[in-house]
């Protein structure tokens, strides 16, 4: 099939161990926030598609959940989803936290990365390694890491980047663009993401929840946008429910006198107003649902396949 427009378009799977910088990288390449970021590992639960243009080439960047050794049902679904994103991609970027791997060569991230490399089935010509966070380390420490992770024949290219500062990102994007097949654009050129607004709103609130509570709340919370009402004045009224597994966790989310949930709501509302470019009325509720992580409906909302035991 001919392509008279001279455009190219395809999928780039961004994979790596938890907290390697996948979401920060995708957000930086897209130029706007499409995936939530926090210091907590396993923040991304579903594949998020960010859309970036480089000349006449469209990159659909799939921010996959971090790949690690799964234990819970939700963990298994996330890891399976990540590998599915790799199988469907036109090229793969394996991103690693170079500072962590140099400082802790036998640590969890190093083990997860080794497992990823052993399972990676993509042709070397379609795979690149991105050493992230180089702005915080000495270049002399990178050579042994490159020799360990990228022996000849494993990757087509190795890029030294900082997803936070932007170092090396244009070179990485240019290589990805070269891998895209000729064809029509998959999305309008001004579209930044492929994610329903209700789900994006839930993800933003979940990010603020994680950022606010740090280590007080484990991965036992989920956010769902139960009501989305467009108002005549152009504003939107959003009702969200934060589901936790125990009453004690509900108390943590609410905070003394409701101050914690108020702060979470204010932070989420400000970001939603910035993204939607209109006034947002956000109402948060906290409910205890012990088995939310076992709900098939929850998996469907996240676009994950429900793994059977």
Each language-model region and where it sits:
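Conserved G1/Walker A P-loop phosphate-binding module
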Residues: 1-91, 96
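Solvent-exposed alpha-helical segments within well-ordered globular domains of core cellular machineries
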Residues: 13, 27, 46, 50, ...
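Conserved glycine(s) of the Walker
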Residues: 21, 168, 260
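Conserved, well-folded catalytic cores of nucleic-acid-processing
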Residues: 32, 51-55, 85-92, 98-99, ...
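Catalytic P-loop NTPase motifs of RecA-like helicase/translocase cores
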Residues: 44, 67-69, 102, 137-138, ...
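Conserved Switch II/interswitch segment of TRAFAC-class P-loop GTPases
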Residues: 87-114, 124-142
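Canonical P-loop GTPase G-domain recognition
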Residues: 125-128, 135-193
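P-loop NTP-binding site
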Residues: 197-309
């Amino acid at each position: 099939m001919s392509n008279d427009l001279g455009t190219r378009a395809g999928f780039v799977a961004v994979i790596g161990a938890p907290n390697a910088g996948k979401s920060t990288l995708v957000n930086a390449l897209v130029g706007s926030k499409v995936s939530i970021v926090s210091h907590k590992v396993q923040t991304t639960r579903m594949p998020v598609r960010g859309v970036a243009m480089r000349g006449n080439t469209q990159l659909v960047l799939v921010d996959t959940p971090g790949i690690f050794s799964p234990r819970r049902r939700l963990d298994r679904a996330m890891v399976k989803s990540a590998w599915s994103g790799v199988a469907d991609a036109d090229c793969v970027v394996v991103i690693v936290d170079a500072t962590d791997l140099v400082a802790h060569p036998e640590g969890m991230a190093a083990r997860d990365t080794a497992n990823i490399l052993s399972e990676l089935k993509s042709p070397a010509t379609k795979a690149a390694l991105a050493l992230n966070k180089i702005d915080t380390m000495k270049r002399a420490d990178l050579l042994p890491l490159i020799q360990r992770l990228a022996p000849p024949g494993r990757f087509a290219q190795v890029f030294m980047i900082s997803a936070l500062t932007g170092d090396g990102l244009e070179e990485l994007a240019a290589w990805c663009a070269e891998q895209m097949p000729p064809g029509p654009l998959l999305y309008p050129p001004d579209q930044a993401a492929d994610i329903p607004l209700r789900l994006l709103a839930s993800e933003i609130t979940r990010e603020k929840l994680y950022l606010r509570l740090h280590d007080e709340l484990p991965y036992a919370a989920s956010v769902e946008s139960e009501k989305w009402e467009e108002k005549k004045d152009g504003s939107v009224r959003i009702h969200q429910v934060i589901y936790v597994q125990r009453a004690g966790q509900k108390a943590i989310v609410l905070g003394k006198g409701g101050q914690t949930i108020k702060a979470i709501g204010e932070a989420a509302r400000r970001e939603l107003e910035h993204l939607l470019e209109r006034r947002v009325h956000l109402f948060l509720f906290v409910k205890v649902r012990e088995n939310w992580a076992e709900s098939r409906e929850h998996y469907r909302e996240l676009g994950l396949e429900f793994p059977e035991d």
